């Protein structure tokens, strides 16, 4: 493809390489390092004048360092006269801080949106935003892609009893997501109402729906410490589910997450590779990964060529 340059930040170079290969491109030359005082240094190693630039950087790992690196890369390309800069952010950072849910709480997702715009981003490509209204925090175009088509494909190919399954949301906020998947699989859905006393701790769970003698498939956009999904798995098994799977777009897996998954009764915990999972998979044999590089690559190709990306909302590109 002419007049396109693809750069990778430090957060997930394996995913960036897969996207580049699917597009038939080589990653652009960029050197990122830290000065002795820990300031981030970025050197763009090739001309981007008049080019359509895409920078892949996921909001994971050292999140603050990686976010700062992305902002500097965007700005470096912008002031080097690129025609357009698109930030490809598979897992959007600070997405859970999307509203003022208590006194004096910051809306940090809005701040991140402002920072990306001020740095010079012309367009954002992301996946399964924690709250879709985050798109409204931007005054530039945002394409929020969905892992759902890839999830549906994985379910059909890897769960033999999927026709006798029930799709379960671990909280009321995910009801729209699970009803969409359940409708497309032509199966029932259920949800779990949870009461939180403080962040990352669930006090009580109430199951709404009948899971008896069915394969329960928990679906959520992300899992962090995994307290919610592990409690949910116990709840589903005690309610008569024959097996429990968890399918998540963003597997953050911080703190006690891995030990909790190892001790929980999951058949598998399936995540996409918006976040690197190689180290976690070595620690937990239950973790499986869905590759979404083809979705990002096709979104980049369609954006570069001025085509619609809505096809990707319901199809997995080859």
From Swiss-Prot:
Q: Which GO terms describe its molecular function?
A: ATP binding; kinase activity; magnesium ion binding; protein homodimerization activity; ribose phosphate diphosphokinase activity
What does UniProt list under activity regulation?
Answer: Activated by magnesium and inorganic phosphate. Competitively or non-competitively inhibited by ADP, 2,3-bisphosphoglyceride or GDP.
Keyword match Nucleotide-binding: yes
InterPro entries, per the entry:
PRib_PP_synth_CS, Pribosyltran_N, PRibTrfase_dom, PRTase-like, Rib-P_diPkinase, Rib-P_diPkinase_bac
Binding-site residues for Mg(2+), renumbered to this chain:
128, 130, 139, 143
**Reaction(s) the record says it catalyses:** D-ribose 5-phosphate + ATP = 5-phospho-alpha-D-ribose 1-diphosphate + AMP + H(+)
Identify the pathway: Metabolic intermediate biosynthesis; 5-phospho-alpha-D-ribose 1-diphosphate biosynthesis; 5-phospho-alpha-D-ribose 1-diphosphate from D-ribose 5-phosphate (route I): step 1/1
Please state the Enzyme Commission number of this protein: 2.7.6.1
Catalytic class of the enzyme: transferase
Under the heading Gene3D superfamilies, the entry gives: 3.40.50.2020
Kindly list the cofactors needed: Mg(2+)
CDD domains listed in its UniProt record: PRTases_typeI (cd06223)
Q: Where does ATP bind?
A: 96-101, 130
Going by the UniProt record, its keywords in alphabetical order are: ATP-binding, Kinase, Magnesium, Metal-binding, Nucleotide biosynthesis, Nucleotide-binding, Transferase
- State how it assembles: Homodimer. The active form is probably a hexamer composed of 3 homodimers.
Q: Briefly state the protein's biological role.
A: Catalyzes the synthesis of phosphoribosylpyrophosphate (PRPP) that is essential for nucleotide synthesis.
Q: Which family does it belong to?
A: Belongs to the ribose-phosphate pyrophosphokinase family.
Q: Which HAMAP family match?
A: RibP_PPkinase_B (MF_00583_B)
Record's protein name? Ribose-phosphate pyrophosphokinase 2
Please report the organism this UniProt entry assigns to the protein.
Xenopus tropicalis (Western clawed frog)
Give the taxonomic lineage as stored in the record. Answer: Eukaryota, Metazoa, Chordata, Craniata, Vertebrata
The coding gene here is prps2
